[in-house]
């Protein structure tokens, strides 16, 4: 028996009266329709209204019968995100502060590149991982987002882009929260945005980043979906990584590397390691050599990230010349490495700066 309300998969999910229609995968919509005496092909029509025509209400789905629309309204809600603040950076990056149905707030970022528009989505209200350089974890974890709330972030940004005939071409799951701590909803989200009948964003244009939740890395290796995979590493030894990322005390670097090796053997896909450079902490050439030794046998890429200022944190940015030296040393040792282009730091939209808290800023 298919029910309209999915079983709650963890205690951190909200308990809303109705499920978001955006949380349903295509096959779940088909099953629901059959259960309610409808034909499966209606699922394609509904998904077209949701993701191609991007309507704001079920009543606008005019090729569905009135009775079906009423049943849909009785069972589902169309998740809407209220834009509380919208800020635009000098480089064109746009940060959205969205209010959720229960009053919590999250942040989502639109980044513009030569190759297209990328959206950085949030998967949790807050975060409990506790990285000592990150703003997202300052208030702790409030709750997980439903798949529909993650989908709605992309849809809301896409509706903004519709005004200029642009589209979201890439998604990075690197906003507030640890995606692998909201694994089932994240996977539903990935499938929904990847469907031909959904937002139709290619799997290879989607990247998920984790701080290193080892059991979920093994799970992710078994998924039949070619999503890009990134790991926030930031140090190549347990002493420094545990100071930067307390999660390392539970999942040591040795265990993390075992899981990553398994993922690579299973999927034959390249891994991206994200390495934030913190002045005087992990940015010396000895650290570069240590990193190169750790990952030398992996098919991987290192994304070097200049640390961004967070008022509550005491880390300082590594000087540019030292960042270039670090990159050069990695390349000398045979490691593919690039320096991430900094975007949105003037509106606190860059790596490590997102938080689920409204600020007194001008809406632009």
Swiss-Prot record:
Name the chemical reaction catalysed here.
adenosine(2503) in 23S rRNA + 2 reduced [2Fe-2S]-[ferredoxin] + 2 S-adenosyl-L-methionine = 2-methyladenosine(2503) in 23S rRNA + 5'-deoxyadenosine + L-methionine + 2 oxidized [2Fe-2S]-[ferredoxin] + S-adenosyl-L-homocysteine; adenosine(37) in tRNA + 2 reduced [2Fe-2S]-[ferredoxin] + 2 S-adenosyl-L-methionine = 2-methyladenosine(37) in tRNA + 5'-deoxyadenosine + L-methionine + 2 oxidized [2Fe-2S]-[ferredoxin] + S-adenosyl-L-homocysteine
EC numbers, comma separated: 2.1.1.192
All residue ranges annotated as the Radical SAM core domain in the record: 113-346
Give the residues annotated as active site. 107 (proton acceptor), 351 (s-methylcysteine intermediate)
Where does the chain bind S-adenosyl-L-methionine?
A: 177-178, 209, 232-234, 308
Keywords, comma-separated and alphabetical: 4Fe-4S, Antibiotic resistance, Cytoplasm, Disulfide bond, Iron, Iron-sulfur, Metal-binding, Methyltransferase, rRNA processing, S-adenosyl-L-methionine, Transferase, tRNA processing
Alphabetical list of PROSITE patterns matching this protein? RADICAL_SAM (PS51918)
Listed under GO cellular component are:
cytoplasm
Any S-S bridges, and between which cysteines? 120-351
What domain of life does the UniProt record list for this protein's source?
Bacteria
Q: Which InterPro entries match?
A: Aldolase_TIM, Methyltransferase_A, RlmN_N, RNA_MTrfase_RlmN, rRNA_lsu_MTrfase_RlmN/Cfr, rSAM
- Annotated residues that bind [4Fe-4S] cluster are located at 127, 131, 134
Q: Where's it mainly located?
A: cytoplasm
The cofactors named for this UniProt entry are: [4Fe-4S] cluster
Query: Per UniProt, what is one GO molecular function of this protein?
Result: 4 iron, 4 sulfur cluster binding
Free-text comment on the cofactor: Binds 1 [4Fe-4S] cluster. The cluster is coordinated with 3 cysteines and an exchangeable S-adenosyl-L-methionine.
What additional remark is attached to this entry?
Reaction proceeds by a ping-pong mechanism involving intermediate methylation of a conserved cysteine residue.
What's this protein's function? Answer: Specifically methylates position 2 of adenine 2503 in 23S rRNA and position 2 of adenine 37 in tRNAs. Confers resistance to some classes of antibiotics.
Please report which protein family the annotation says this sequence is part of.
Belongs to the radical SAM superfamily. RlmN family.
The identity of this protein, by name, is Probable dual-specificity RNA methyltransferase RlmN
The organism's lineage?
Bacteria, Bacillati, Bacillota, Bacilli, Bacillales
Gene name per UniProt: rlmN
């Amino acid at each position: 028996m298919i029910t309209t309300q999915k079983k709650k998969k963890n205690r951190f999910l909200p308990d809303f009266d109705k499920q978001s229609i955006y949380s349903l995968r295509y096959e779940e919509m088909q099953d629901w329709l059959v259960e309610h005496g409808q034909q499966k092909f209606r699922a394609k029509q509904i998904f077209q209204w949701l993701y191609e025509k991007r309507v704001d209400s079920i009543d606008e789905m005019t090729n569905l019968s009135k009775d079906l629309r009423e049943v849909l309204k009785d069972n589902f809600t169309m998740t809407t995100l209220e834009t509380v603040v919208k800020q635009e950076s000098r480089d064109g990056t746009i940060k959205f502060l969205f209010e959720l149905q229960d009053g919590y707030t999250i942040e989502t970022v639109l980044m513009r590149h030569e190759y297209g528009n990328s959206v950085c989505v949030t998967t949790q209200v807050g975060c409990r991982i506790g990285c000592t350089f990150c703003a997202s974890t300052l208030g702790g974890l409030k709750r997980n987002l439903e798949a529909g709330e993650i989908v709605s972030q992309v849809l809301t940004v896409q509706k903004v882009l519709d005004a200029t005939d642009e589209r979201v071409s890439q998604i990075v799951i690197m906003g507030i929260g640890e995606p692998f701590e909201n694994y089932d909803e994240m996977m539903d989200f990935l499938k929904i945005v990847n469907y031909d009948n959904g937002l139709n964003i290619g799997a290879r244009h989607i990247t998920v980043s984790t701080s290193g939740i080892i059991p979920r890395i093994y799970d992710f290796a078994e998924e039949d979906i070619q999503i890009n995979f990134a790991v926030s590493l930031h140090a190549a030894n347990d002493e420094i990584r545990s100071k930067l990322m307390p999660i390392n005390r539970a999942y040591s670097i040795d265990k993390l590397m075992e899981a990553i090796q398994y993922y690579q053997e299973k999927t034959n896909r390249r891994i991206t390691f994200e390495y934030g450079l913190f002045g005087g902490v992990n940015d010396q050439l000895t650290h570069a050599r240590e990193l190169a030794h750790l990952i030398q046998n992996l098919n991987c890429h290192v994304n070097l990230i200049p640390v961004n200022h967070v008022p509550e944190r005491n880390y300082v940015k590594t000087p540019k010349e030292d960042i270039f030296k670090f990159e050069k040393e990695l390349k000398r040792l045979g490691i593919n490495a690039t320096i991430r282009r900094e975007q949105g730091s003037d509106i606190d939209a860059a790596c490590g700066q997102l938080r689920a808290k409204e600020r007194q800023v001008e809406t632009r």
